[in-house]
Amino acid sequence: MGLPTLEFSDSYLDSPDFRERLQCHEIELERTNKFIKELLKDGSLLIGALRNLSMAVQKFSQSLQDFQFECIGDAETDDEISIAQSLKEFARLLIAVEEERRRLIQNANDVLIAPLEKFRKEQIGAAKADSQIGREHQNFYEASLEYVFKIQEVQEKKKFEFVEPLLSFLQGLFTFYHEGYELAQEFAPYKQQLQFNLQNTRNNFESTRQEVERLMQRMKSANQDYRPPSQWTMEGYLYVQEKRPLGFTWTKHYCTYDKGSKMFTMSVSDVKASGKMNGLVTGSPEMFKLKSCIRRKTDSIDKRFCFDIEVVERHGIITLQAFSEANRKLWLEAMDGKEPIYTLPAIISKKEEMYLNEAGFNFVRKCIQAVEMRGITILGLYRIGGVNSKVQKLMNTTFSPKSPPDMDIDIELWDNKTITSGLKNYLRCLAEPLMTYKLHKDFIIAVKSDDQNYRVEAVHALVHKLPEKNREMLDILIKHLLKVSLHSQQNLMTISNLGVIFGPTLMRAQEETVAAMMNIKFQNIVVEILIEHYEKIFHTAPDPNIPLPQPQSRSGSRRTRAICLSTGSRKPRGRYTPCLAEPDSDSYSSSPDSTPMGSIESLSSHSSEQNSTTKSTACQPREKSGGIPWITTPSSSNGQKSQGLWTTSPESSSREDATKTDVESDCQSVASITIPGNVSPPIDLVKKGPYGLSGLKRSSASSSLRSISAAEGNKSYSGSIQSLTSIGSKESPKAIPNPELPPKMCRRLRLDTASSNGYQRPGSVVAAKAQLFENAGSPKPVSSGRQAQAMYSCKAEHSHELSFPQGAIFSNVHPSVEPGWLKATYEGRTGLVPENYVVFL
């Protein structure tokens, strides 16, 4: 029930009813006054809490900003660099949100506190002061009229002067929340890419951990005196008997022995309570040439595990004491002592070795033939192992001395898992790995290079340095793995997954150490490069001018060229976002990012909930030298025929793999997903936003992006593409027509530098969202030496580009090594022009 009205005529009568109605208004104003006081108090507490929260978040952000990741090994993968930089990205994002919160707090006093306080004091207070009118007898009627007018005025002004400040404060609060929403939208692509990096790193960690754990268990179960091979035939601590005036003393020495030169070295290494270096006292090493070694008779000395040696430089014998009987046997064996030569414990002895002979080649070919004939689309091919007893039976049957070299494999007798496990077991048990110990370090150094192009060229050259049989076997195997990867839509065995499985098998380290285990991730990359660049590596001669890999120190500059969030001023959103960095800056070119292993469910939460409207682009597939041409594979769901499925060229790499001179174009990361009821056209995954996927320059044709399909029932996606594309919308996507002026589809990559993760922003906290556009023309091959006309004008952003007006005529137009760009001549000057800016005449 509302307040009764106050009539001016009633004020002259001053009736009891008028007094009662007037009192109702005064009581309401008093209640409003108390409420505003409480509201101001609570508002001050809210602002104080926001200020404390802001300070806490800023301190948290600073902690994230200051922390520095360090990784094991002398080089880092792009995944590790991205993950190491992620904390700084989180810090920048939080700082951007806190900047908006700071503005909210600064304006809160002017928007909320001051207006309400002013209204309470000036309006309600004035009405309360007028309540003294009862005591005034002079000019009673005139004052009464003014009082009634004031009461009415305050009651009406309360409706807007009281609520308006609250609305302004809430508007500011919602502006802050909207800013957080925009930042979350902007952060989503980076978050997805970081999830890819994390999943990829986790898979690498799992494979590395298994190898390290296996090595640790072998060391635990083996005799503690087992020592991996090194530059010395034998080394370790021994006690040396030294004569003293009153008897003998035993001094601990660190001794080494080289069997080839027969040089024996002793370095004093004894612990003194008052010595320096934490009690460790070391002396200069003494070197001797060994003459003979003999075991000391047990009853001739009161010490155990002793043996005597004679050296050229000293007269008499030197008595040494080992730590155990097994350790003494190893020393005697190394020095050709008069003890029998004992072998290493059986548990660490090598498995039965295989060889690259006729039987081995036949076995590999038969296994591959069986897999390709009946099981190349089986889910988890090569990842899921067979039963050990069956695998061992297959190996014993095939490689038995009585078996002929060309023995057939009965595919009815052996299941697919047993055959694939047998193939891996054969390669794993070779006396020397297929890539050889000699070239192992060279391959590792090659893929540690920051230069993506050099990686491929160096691996190409090193493969041709392999022995003929090794290269022939590698050719057979990699050709098969390429076929397997082309069916990753069904078997989920992407190039990245195959690299994880066959990397340690083909590039087994000679020394089983933790340091060698840390290089497993680079072994995987070598295999990925071999698969993706199969045609070039095995069917073309390497460039003789490519220098062989040289050992290099860990680069400290790679991490500085990482993802960055600018804190510049806000700019309005445009339809298309232009270049995100200066042409000469490191951030202008994007380095390869890695893509994760194939997983059906991982990172798929964004696939079906984003973008009810899809903007798309069609890029021109091109067949490049050393690569596999783009193919279109029909796929269907429940009998419903779907659109052709674009698959990316294996020439682009999946993790840190280098591209050739023809660096993969952004537009080659096009993929199409078919869902019953709605079909989306190919989508350009390149988002030129602050967290856009421009960092996928090379990983655009990642093995994980090789193929995508969506089943009607569960909408499961092969590979890990699902969280990258976000296409599976619940509503039917609609294509947006071509804009008048398309942006340059493919930013040129500078081949002389390799920046890290290329997520740039054009100077704003909430940058312009990535734009996708549709190319109505069908893909046409680019011919050499033709004329072309410019459809749009263009201003050069780099010294190697051409500036030209609309309608300009180009001559001698032919493809360039830059993806998405053509080389042309205009007005006597030759340079690069965007491929989608011109039409051939």
From Swiss-Prot:
Residues 191-227 form a coiled coil. CDD domains: BAR-PH_GRAF_family, SH3_GRAF3. Residues 7-228 form the BAR domain. Residues 783-841 form the SH3 domain. Residues 231-340 form the PH domain. Residues 586-616 have a biased composition (Low complexity). Residues 632-652 have a biased composition (Polar residues). The record marks 383 as: Arginine finger. The modification Phosphoserine is found at residues 649, 707, 720, 723, 778. Residues 342-538 form the Rho-GAP domain. Residues 653-663 have a biased composition (Basic and acidic residues). It holds the Pfam family PH. PANTHER family: OLIGOPHRENIN 1 (PTHR12552), RHO GTPASE-ACTIVATING PROTEIN 42 (PTHR12552:SF3). May influence blood pressure by functioning as a GTPase-activating protein for RHOA in vascular smooth muscle. This is Rho GTPase-activating protein 42. It comes from Mus musculus.
